[in-house]
Amino acid sequence: ACSKQLGEKCKCNKQCCGATVVCGTIWVGGKEVNKCMSKTSNNWFLNKLGEGMNAVANAFSISCN
């Protein structure tokens, strides 16, 4: 079952609650941070980034127990 909401740190997609919410990687101050984020956003740049990340995430699906 999902346990994380948008903006919370996560390890894999299924932890994040919501049909369009994925566990994505962002960079904060040079450090990699995994957070639950929406696949779609109002920002076209983030959308393009998200599309690429989803393709990568789907290819190397992160699994967690």
UniProtKB/Swiss-Prot annotation:
It comes from the Eukaryota. One of its GO terms (cellular component) is extracellular region. Its main location: secreted. Contains 4 disulfide bonds. GO terms for molecular function: toxin activity. Expressed by the venom gland. It is found in: Secreted. Signal peptide: none annotated. The keyword Membrane does not apply. Keywords: Disulfide bond, Neurotoxin, Secreted, Toxin. Belongs to the neurotoxin 25 family. F7 subfamily. In vivo, intrathorax injection into crickets causes death. This is U15-hexatoxin-Mg1b. It comes from Macrothele gigas.
